[in-house]
């Protein structure tokens, strides 16, 4: 599938999805090599706290409102945000959690990139896109992203 063309103001938020896909790749590689799942879960928890929380906040505060709270795509994305959050914070079965994080985060990112962000890009006003970019910039400048 050819890369999707993103509006300039959506690119910084969209680019963060690549970081999530890289985490999925690292998890897959670690699982294949039989690396310590507890160490990998700590790395995932760090990623969750340093990257994913702020990314979810940007999407929920600025991206999703473009479509509205009742939009089925937004409802799905919000539900998918809750699921990885539980997985990133659960330590009962790290091996199983790592596998689920890898599968579900990758599927979620693909959905957002191929479907949700595409729709946002089609309907967003320039003001809405500027708000997304501005919020992302504020979080990035405070070193949260």
Indicate where each model-derived feature is located:
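Small-residue-biased structural context
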Residues: 1-145
């Amino acid at each position: 599938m050819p890369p999707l063309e993103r509006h300039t103001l959506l690119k910084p938020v969209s680019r963060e999805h690549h970081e999530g896909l890289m985490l999925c790749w690292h998890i897959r590689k670690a699982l294949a090599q039989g690396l310590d799942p507890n160490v990998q879960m700590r790395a995932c928890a760090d990623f969750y706290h340093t990257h994913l929380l702020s990314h979810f906040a940007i999407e929920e505060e600025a991206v999703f409102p473009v479509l509205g709270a009742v939009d089925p795509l937004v409802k799905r994305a919000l539900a998918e945000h809750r699921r990885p959050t539980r997985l990133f914070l659960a330590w009962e079965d790290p091996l199983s959690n790592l596998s689920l994080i890898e599968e579900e985060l990758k599927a979620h990112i693909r959905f957002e990139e191929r479907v949700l962000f595409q729709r946002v890009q089609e309907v967003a006003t320039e003001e809405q896109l500027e708000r997304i970019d501005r919020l992302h910039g504020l979080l990035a400048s405070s070193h949260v992203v």
